[in-house]
Design a protein with these regions (language model features):
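N-terminal intrinsically disordered, cationic/polar leader segments
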Residues: 1-205
Length: 205
């Protein structure tokens, strides 16, 4: 109660001491230790964001490119207990199952070509890490749960493959959320978790 404020430069010095280290929970823990020692804090929380690159091969042509995932590593130190939290934004395409059925109905009954509407979709997956889990593992879990991830390198044959993949896996937002939850719940390296899925509307105003 007797403290009146904080010197922001002291906070930054705690972080800059680890500027040359690789981005990891271990480095964040070391920075948090310095922060608590330098400022005499009992509880603390730190979150660091980054764009994490992973090489991705196209669906059919075999081209390779870099997919950048928005991630955040969060460390919470409260009452002597530390919690590691990993956040991942997974971007995918979602074809509306209802729209797909209507398109097929138009083709079958009237010979009319129709296009089902698809949305650019994002799932924010936040997990409490209790085992040996890293970003690549989270991406692999997300890809297996919902396979229609947006692509990096695309030729005509890749675009066709992506269209086929979307048609074979139409999905509502609530179903996507359930699939992500099932994948996270089944992994022993994950404690608590939260899934926020958003299918960005392409039909309604």
């Amino acid at each position: 109660a007797e403290k009146k404020g904080i010197n922001m430069s002291r906070i930054m010095r705690s972080f800059y001491a680890h500027a040359d280290s690789a981005f990891s929970f271990g480095v964040i823990e070391a920075a948090l230790d310095d922060y608590k020692r330098d400022l005499g804090s009992f509880d603390a929380r730190i979150q660091m964001r980054s764009a994490f690159p992973m090489q991705m091969t196209s669906l059919r042509s075999g081209l390779a490119g870099w997919q950048y995932y928005d991630i955040a590593l969060e460390l919470v130190d409260r009452a002597g207990v530390r919690t590691r939290i990993l956040h991942l934004d997974y971007v995918y395409s979602s074809t509306c199952p209802c729209s797909l059925e209507l398109s097929e109905h138009a083709r079958a009954t009237r010979g009319q070509l129709a296009t089902p509407h698809s949305q650019r979709s994002v799932a924010r997956l936040s997990v409490v890490v209790t085992g040996d889990l890293w970003v690549e593992d989270m991406v692999d879990l997300a890809r297996k749960a919902v396979v229609t991830e947006t692509q990096v390198m695309v030729k005509r044959e890749d675009e066709q493959a992506f269209a086929e993949l979307n048609a074979a896996n139409p999905i509502f937002v609530e179903d996507a959320a359930r699939l992500f939850c099932e994948a996270l719940r089944a992994d022993p390296r994950i404690g608590d978790f939260r899934v926020v899925a958003s299918h960005q509307e392409s039909l309604h105003s």
